[in-house]
Curated annotation (Swiss-Prot):
It holds the Pfam family AA_kinase. Residues 270-347 form the PUA domain. Keywords: Amino-acid biosynthesis, ATP-binding, Cytoplasm, Kinase, Nucleotide-binding, Proline biosynthesis, Transferase. It catalyses: L-glutamate + ATP = L-glutamyl 5-phosphate + ADP. One of its GO terms (molecular function) is RNA binding. The lineage of its organism: Bacteria, Bacillati, Cyanobacteriota, Cyanophyceae, Synechococcales. It comes from Parasynechococcus marenigrum (strain WH8102). Its main location: cytoplasm. The gene is proB. PROSITE patterns: GLUTAMATE_5_KINASE (PS00902), PUA (PS50890). This is Glutamate 5-kinase. GO terms for cellular component: cytosol. Belongs to the glutamate 5-kinase family. It is an enzyme of class 2 (transferase).
């Protein structure tokens, strides 16, 4: 059995939404018939809400967008319910916020619920809870959400369906010699691609940056990621049967486990700790815990046992972890004279995850 997570972007659910969803449902049903299981992460609530409310244009304020999403989410689920019922498959709605997945207990509850639905042969349809998600804590067009869901359920494959045929070295609409990219094998390749995606232009602002971020999260968790054109719903059926297409992001050879993936990607850092070179070496080479003696600066305001970003002397992020001390306690220790005896542990190695070098 292969466990798939499939993400459908907003751009694919325009026009005749019912016919489009019916096309995707046929491919999903065929996968179920082969014994595979699928989790669907679907956008589209705002657009359907705008249609239902007969709004002349997409709202611009956060409150209006949230209200449109609340109206459209029921419409979206009704379409999936009807389409999958034709194949004898039940669907279940899962709405989450970023803060849900940042809380370890709620993260585990969401994972458990999804696993139970899959055991029952139900198709979970996951979406961000747009009606209540703060603007500053949004996932980013559900790309990040799909990667976090894939990690939470231990998926084998993540498919990101969009309105482009593959990843390119630059925006092919603007750069005539943009090079198509079929495979991405290493995080360093992602670094270079993210640098291009972030340098402006329609390619950088049009959603490719969030797809690269999603690929980084999923591949670090041992999941193969496919970025492919979903404008023809039959393409999903081919991908679910194992056909190659678009761009394939290959999984890291030493994937993070469930907890370490959660530490690295689901948490939102509340502050930063800057480390000296000796502490950086100790973390990378010896797998040590972070001691107070290795910290040179603290930034932000956070309480004990909250997530922080760890950075080296050059400002580059090394990893993330749960800080056992509050920011105030760390600052007091930095301001005080060095204490006699062993240096206290600030981030334990079991609550710490480092990025690949």
């Amino acid at each position: 059995m292969t466990l798939w997570v499939v993400k459908l972007g907003t751009s694919l659910l325009r026009g005749d939404t019912a016919a489009t969803i019916a096309g995707f449902a046929a491919g999903i049903a065929a996968a179920f018939a082969r014994g595979d299981r699928v989790v669907l992460v679907s956008s589209g609530a705002v657009g359907l809400g705008c249609q239902r409310l007969q709004l002349p244009q997409r709202p611009e304020t956060v409150v209006a967008l949230q209200a449109a999403a609340a109206t459209g989410q029921g419409q979206l689920m009704a379409l999936y319910e009807r389409a999958l019922a034709n194949h004898g498959i039940a669907v279940a709605q899962i709405l989450v916020t970023r803060s849900d997945l940042a809380d370890r207990r709620r993260y585990q509850n969401a994972s458990g619920t999804l696993q139970q639905l899959l055991q029952w042969g139900v198709l979970p349809v996951v979406n961000e809870n747009d009606a209540i998600s703060p603007a500053e804590l949004r996932f980013g067009d559900n790309d990040t959400l799909s990667a976090l869901v894939a990690a939470a359920v231990g998926a084998d494959q993540l498919i990101l369906l969009t309105d482009v045929d593959r990843l390119y070295s630059a925006d092919p609409r603007l750069v005539v010699d943009a090079r198509p990219i079929s495979d991405v094998h290493h995080p360093r390749e992602l670094d270079a691609l993210e640098a291009v995606a972030g340098d402006g232009g329609r390619w950088g602002r049009g959603g490719m940056t969030t797809k690269l971020a999603a690929a980084r999260i999923a591949t670090a968790s041992g999941i193969t990621v496919h970025l492919a054109d979903g404008r023809d719903p039959r393409r999903l059926d081919a991908l679910l049967q194992g056909e190659r297409g678009g761009t394939v992001f290959h999984p890291h050879p030493e994937p993070l486990g469930n907890r370490r993936s959660w530490l690295a990607h689901a948490l939102q850092p509340q502050g930063e700790l800057t480390l000296d070179a000796g502490a950086c070496d100790a973390l990378h080479q010896r797998g040590s815990s972070l001691l107070m003696v290795g910290i040179t600066a603290v930034k932000g305001v956070f309480g004990a046992n909250q997530p922080v970003r760890l950075q080296g002397p050059d400002g580059r992020e090394l990893g993330r972890g749960l800080c056992q001390l509050s920011s105030a306690a760390v600052q007091r220790a930095l301001d005080a004279a060095p204490a006699a005896g062993p240096s206290p542990v600030v981030v334990h190695r079991d609550a710490l995850v480092l990025h690949s070098r």
